[in-house]
């Protein structure tokens, strides 16, 4: 970047420059190796926070379980998970008292969701623990495998396509004495290559049937697989995150639907809204506290931090909350919602890949899988790892650790927010019955607390009371990491508030630049990011113009498409110069074909092809966008595509950009090395799954796509649709009689084949 950074700060108020102190430029740190150590840390820490609870043994799986609920009240400031049931229930009751009908209405909304949600809801999401293969898979594949196994074991309620019916199968599967599954495995054999006469290793993929008894199946159904969270900025240590299997996901989805519906009605909740809507919500709470404190009162704000939010939460507490929230509802509904917390109370954490050992002297590397940690001699490990393993051993079963207390990251964000808000809600004067009162904001584990009181002593007393109330429900405000300021300056979910929200522009820095999808998408995403930041993040016109120039420069270097009249020599310059010389209207060439950049900050919303269309030579137009040109990628032309952009914190968010299909919208091919591994069988399944879905979409384009109702299979739906369409086309003269007859014949053949099968 050839920009003098000090120029950016000449007229910037100091508080607006906060964003430059964030660790958000450059590449974020990624983890390498296994997450086994981090997972053991999580399991051990969680048990330590609840160590004075009661130990029991799960009768089905034999797993030892620790229950800290209603445990001893804390006597010091150490984080602890001893939530008191009666306190949580009382907080819920007060929340309902100050928001009459909130639980009732949310239950009604959720009941509707439960009855309408289709099972394909579970295909959203990235990596999911696939219990049939005992490893992670894309969500759609994991769901397909689960349903396939269910059907081969006689569980067929899921065929209706409703999520609730799939969950009925899940419940039934847990009562079965055994489940039969298909697993992939790999055979290696040495054979002599005919051509080279050398010995080579041949790998073949096999599928084999395996029976799981009730105990093994339950352990798998209750397992969360763990991985290391990547790309976390500003931290020295990595940490583990969990991905649950398909048995748990559906139940969690409904619980979160209920909690989301409640959060939407709570003014202190930072979820589920985001962006500008969230800022408006927060500004309202601040305004309320400041107006009320004008003359007589002091008002202070704590930028809060909770210690290990997830590890001190407890699924048993969530069960109590759900039982209370749904207390007047039908029995079936209460049962469906109580299953997720019950499963989480019995969860098992999979320890991941295990440890890698290498001997420098003998040049040997060997993997110690997690399953062996229970029995292996500890002399091979260093001190810290040895301590971890010793501590976790009593909890181990088949390479998974029993983890009853605690919630893994990101599982019940909405429900835990409801718990946090219920404590903020207790700050009203009518509840504190004294001169101080509080309010605040809660978004998952992040909070901001605003305390008003006539004097400093009152403020202190209010903060203390809040702190102690939180302890009673298993929330541990960190005294070291929270800080207090006069109201008007605080930070909440990385929004900085100083008499209004300051744009924290550095958060967006990682999403500037060339994404690396293809020339067409990258150009479109790049300008859309700049446009969005002008709208949402105070990116001023001069800086935006500069960002645009830097982006174009970056883009040209990435794709080696410098202007046709430049002196820069690259691998592509010969072809680009040739095109430049034979083009009459040079302004019409796309930047990726060596053309000039016509973007400025006024026309960022127009796709480049549209911007230059009138300027293009006719034959160039014909090559660029011709559907008959084999290089034009034509997935059905959607006018809008989705890109995944990485903001600096939080999950990758999806961003829409305009997509025009041209010769530059190529799709890179899959890496071939996967084809030689045991995952090949899985990849083939995935491709078959993909092909079926694509075919189905051809028959039911999204404009007319109402889900086929009734029990018909995908094939039946497609055949009947083909017949209807063919008849309409024949009667309106769009197709000839022979074509019509041929289509009908194909349809009959397909039905005949299905009958024989």
Swiss-Prot record:
E.C. numbers: 2.7.7.48
GO CC annotation terms, alphabetical: host cell cytoplasm; host cell nucleus
GO terms for biological process, alphabetical: DNA-templated transcription; symbiont-mediated suppression of host gene expression; symbiont-mediated suppression of host mRNA transcription via inhibition of RNA polymerase II activity; viral RNA genome replication; viral transcription
Residue ranges of the region described as Disordered: 52-82
Region listing for Promoter-binding site, in residue ranges: 249-256
Biased amino acid composition, Polar residues: 55-64
Annotated family: Belongs to the influenza viruses polymerase PB1 family.
Protein name, UniProt field: RNA-directed RNA polymerase catalytic subunit
Taxonomic lineage from the root: Viruses, Riboviria, Orthornavirae, Negarnaviricota, Polyploviricotina
